[in-house]
Amino acid sequence: MINFDEFMKVDLRIAKVIDAENVEQADKLIKITVDLGKEQRIIFAGIKDIYEPDSLIGRNIVVVANLEPRKMRFGVSEGMLLAAGDDENGVFLVTPDTGASPGMRVR
């Protein structure tokens, strides 16, 4: 278990997907460009078998904004999106209510 102070170190932010494309040589990856309000980031997400890239564009999602960048075979991933799911029911992106805008901190 982590304590409350450790949990508070995780910076969850609202991000708007402004571009998404399949990573051609990867079975599961989509390259997603997000707007975090004051900056844009690239995130590689293993959701290719669940979402079409075009269906992601314009959506607000929740991302981990202070995750250390991770060098991958196809580029550097600068965050992680949040999703819920299991093998039986599939995977679903965590999305905010209407009114939330890019850069807002999830509390």
Which residues are covered by each model-predicted region?
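Phosphate-backbone binding interfaces of nucleic-acid-interacting proteins
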Residues: 1-107
